[in-house]
């Protein structure tokens, strides 16, 4: 990654696709009427180094919070009750599942078309992918990872594709530590993940 071991004064968010802003709460975005500041000493969502202090509500070790599928109009969850709706499946997942089935049946054009419906829908408006074969499957894996982020699919997808033992061994969690307007790409917890 171009971020590994580097720092920058330029926020990295502008170069990311629209689904990032719909999925993640990050420094400078608005959440529940507040501009979030996920930096060291930040006022709304402050950064906290891993195990530097005991858990503190409203702090982050990655520089990010989850936004996807949350309703900003609802009050914060207290205890074990919430009025937040549970989303079990979305139409985008149905299209991606069908695209993968088409790929497995060597129906390349149908697979491309289905994935591109997800990429080209209103609010996302990304250009279509025209790859085929193994290149298409790599594009598809990335598309699924982004589109279905934090919906509970990736771990099981990786197992189903028999790639978990490759991708998840010696894997590390990364994030951004923002100090005085400088963005630093960091290891969040300094631990290599091991997959059995």
Predicted feature residues:
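Acidic/polar-rich alpha-helix caps and helix-coil junctions
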Residues: 1-196
């Amino acid at each position: 990654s171009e971020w590994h071991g580097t720092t920058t004064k330029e926020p990295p968010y502008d170069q990311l696709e629209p689904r990032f802003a719909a999925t993640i709460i990050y420094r400078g975005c608005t959440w529940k009427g507040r501009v979030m500041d996920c930096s060291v000493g930040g006022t709304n969502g402050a950064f906290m180094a891993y195990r530097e202090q005991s858990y503190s509500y409203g702090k982050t070790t990655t520089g990010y919070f989850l936004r996807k599928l949350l309703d900003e109009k609802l009050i914060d969850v207290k205890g074990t009750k919430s009025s937040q709706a549970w989303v079990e499946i979305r139409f985008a997942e149905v299209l991606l599942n069908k695209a993968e089935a088409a790929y497995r049946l060597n129906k390349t054009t149908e697979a491309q078309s289905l994935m591109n419906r997800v990429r080209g829908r209103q609010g996302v408006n990304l250009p279509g992918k025209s790859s085929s074969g193994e290149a298409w499957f790599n594009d598809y894996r990335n598309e699924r990872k982004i589109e279905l982020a934090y919906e509970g699919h990736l771990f099981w997808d990786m197992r189903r594709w028999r790639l978990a033992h490759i991708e998840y061994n010696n894997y590390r969690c990364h994030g951004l530590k923002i100090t005085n307007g400088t963005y630093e790409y960091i290891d969040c917890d300094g631990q290599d993940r091991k997959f059995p």
